Swiss-Prot record:
Its EC number is 1.1.1.255. Gene3D superfamilies: Medium-chain alcohol dehydrogenases, catalytic domain (3.90.180.10), NAD(P)-binding Rossmann-like Domain (3.40.50.720). Its cofactor is Zn(2+). It catalyses: D-mannitol + NAD(+) = D-mannose + NADH + H(+). This is Probable mannitol dehydrogenase. It comes from Medicago sativa (Alfalfa).
């Protein structure tokens, strides 16, 4: 007879879980492992709400196992360390992102590319040693030290939480594909959780940044608040035509199905388009503009642990955080409804510790 999530491991834990494809979250008692020799135990203070949390809750990608406790933008304080842990101490502010385990022996792991390990264990909804992982919509987590990162002292913990997914998701491809040369022109397609952080990275790298959006009412915010240099309404044919061949790079953060062809037209010769938005349906693409303009389309999946630490340190140096709306856990279902409607500027973050302190 299978054990229940509440009793299968030694440590009692509490969070909010969805039980079915309605995606509705409610209180959930489960259990976590004891802190091992290489582990770090973290009391969760804040957890960002990622669009992939919503996809997983609804089983949009077809691999959700219920009950599921989402959350992979975790910031908290260390409460216990194993005897082999030298990098972290009790009381440190730390982060836990999208992955909590990998094989640690393959070529990718040996190159600090754990996110491309063929056997990754994600922070939630992954099988792991006979049980499943549960994420950061909960009171604490136990993680192998390799998958924990130090949080810079000058970054606010709540507004820094989304950097652990949204931040590294745009930082890693910008670095890998060389989209960092000062003075070059970066297009940011989509102004949401990923896009607004991409603007900030672009400006920190010294790029000219243009936001590409279907929503003209976002222009003032993009330029005056987030620091973009210009704004391009993608459903305005005349403005799109005038902007053709003007951009060196585009990072496409759009999570809805859309055609890549208009974006390719904006690129110069040798331009690079990198997509990170994970639409649930295939995107329209013709190879002709790639061949004719020697253009590149690429993708990227979060970042390895070494690069995630590098990204956080970069954010600390340049005072980069996410723009957030702080919520309590009991508000999470309303937040998910709003996220589905893109009604957030620009990332929800759950005040986990204060949500559970009265329980």
């Amino acid at each position: 007879m299978a054990k229940s999530p509440e009793t299968e491991l030694p440590l009692k834990a509490f969070g909010w879980a969805a039980r079915d494809t309605s995606g509705t979250l409610s209180p959930f008692h489960f259990s976590r492992r004891e802190n091992g020799d290489d582990d770090v135990s973290v009391k969760i203070l804040y957890c960002g709400v990622c669009h992939s949390d919503l996809h997983t809750l609804k089983n949009d990608w077809g691999f959700t196992t219920y009950p599921v406790v989402p959350g992979h933008e975790i910031v908290g304080v260390v409460t216990k360390v194993g005897i082999n842990v030298k990098k972290f101490r009790v009381g440190d502010n730390v982060g836990v992102g999208v992955i909590v385990e990998s094989c640690q022996t393959c070529e990718n792991c040996n190159q600090d590319l754990e996110q491309y390990c063929p056997k990754p264990v994600f922070t939630y909804n992954s099988p792991y040693k006979g049980t499943r992982t549960y994420g950061g919509y909960s009171d604490f987590v136990v993680v192998h030290q390799r998958y924990v990162v130090q949080f810079p002292d000058n970054l606010p913990l709540d507004a820094g939480a989304p950097l652990l997914c949204a931040g590294i998701t745009v930082y890693s491809p910008m670095k890998y594909y060389g989209m960092t040369e000062p003075g070059k022109h970066l297009g940011v397609a989509g102004l949401g959780g990923l896009g607004h952080v991409a603007i900030k990275f672009g400006k920190a790298f010294g790029l000219k940044v243009t936001v590409i959006s279907t929503s003209p009412n976002k222009e003032t915010e993009a330029i005056d608040k987030l620091g973009a240099d210009s704004f391009l309404v993608s459903k305005d044919p005349e403005k799109m035509k005038a902007a053709m061949g003007t951009m060196d790079y585009i990072i496409d953060t759009i999570s809805a199905a859309h055609s890549l062809m208009p974006l390719l037209g904006l690129l110069k010769l040798n331009g690079k388009l990198v997509t990170v938005g994970l639409p649930s349906k295939p995107l329209e693409l013709s190879v002709f503009p790639l061949v004719a303009g020697r253009k590149l389309i690429g993708g990227s999946n979060i970042g390895g642990m070494k690069e995630t630490q590098e990204m956080l340190d970069f954010c600390g140096k340049h005072n980069i955080t996410a723009d957030i709306e702080l919520i309590k856990m009991h508000e999470i279902n309303t937040a998910m409804e709003r996220l589905h409607k893109a009604d957030v500027k620009y990332r929800f973050v759950i005040d986990v510790a204060n949500s559970f302190s009265s329980l």
